[in-house]
């Protein structure tokens, strides 16, 4: 009898992607985060769907509809907090996944990498519009400040901002369209994720050594399915612990105050996962310059394959590059901390230095270190 798994048109696709897929025998736990991101996406879509059933995208009722979900809907509180903290988990997994790609040279699969950067931008856009929906103080002012940055675009800026707002300020029209975007974007992300996997399966996975492993492959199932299930269980445990013990740990207390256009919060700041980019934005005194630096801080990822000067793909045998990589991680953590601090004396200069170091590391120091390491190979 012919195995239906290998012949059925639909089952065959699933089989080739998740069961009989040849995978390198030496990939470590850092390769778990791709499947965890898929799990994050499913969690967010499901919890988001149930929230959307009870949420009303209207300035007069949005805040109270979220309160209604938490108080009156059966298990509404846990759905709401799973969704909010699920977003944080999503970004933790995303940043680790990107870090893994940088460390082990996975960016050399250029199509996969570029679609990954596009996915990152999409997830960031989704998280931003989603943060506006509860219509608390930080939702309103975050939306006002971030959308206002577009006014820095010469000539069309002001018109563009008013077009996005649907009026002369962030109001009912803005909230309604942000809800529409927040609903549609995850499905676009799902489609892009399939394309991301499609390109990955054209080349096969990279591995920690960065050396082709075609002569030493093992089937994905059962070896990596069991490993992914362990990762998924640890992920679920972390998410549930965060949600049930300290659901507001990563949120902003200001968002428990209904949006008030007449009262500005003392410190306007986005969610923690955007703070590094926010710190880069704030470190440049010029509006247009800040916006360009903000964009470049993410889009610089597209340039990374072009900046590859090393003869080795992975950083596993490159001590100088390793040192610079971990300096970059520390720098991003510093920027995240600075982004959450008020704009005053010690923080301003620290933020500016950290921003300069961020671009310097990626554009100059890492390629230079790779060239030095190439020379050392000849010794």
From Swiss-Prot:
UniProt keyword list: Electron transport, Heme, Iron, Membrane, Metal-binding, Mitochondrion, Mitochondrion inner membrane, Respiratory chain, Transmembrane, Transmembrane helix, Transport, Ubiquinone
Membrane topology value: Multi-pass membrane protein
SUPFAM superfamilies assigned: a domain/subunit of cytochrome bc1 complex (Ubiquinol-cytochrome c reductase), Transmembrane di-heme cytochromes
Cofactor binding remark: Binds 2 heme b groups non-covalently.
InterPro entries reported for this sequence: Cyt_b/b6_C, Cyt_b/b6_C_sf, Cyt_b/b6_N, Cytb/b6-like_sf, Cytochrome_b, Cytochrome_b_C_euk/bac, Cytochrome_b_N_euk/bac, Di-haem_cyt_TM
Superkingdom of this protein's organism: Eukaryota
Gene3D superfamilies: Cytochrome Bc1 Complex, Chain C (1.20.810.10)
GO biological process, one term: mitochondrial electron transport, ubiquinol to cytochrome c
Binding residues annotated for a ubiquinone, in chain numbering: 201
Recorded GO CC terms: mitochondrial inner membrane; respiratory chain complex III
Positions of heme b b566 binding: 97, 196
Name under which the protein is recorded: Cytochrome b
Organism field: Phocoena phocoena (Harbor porpoise)
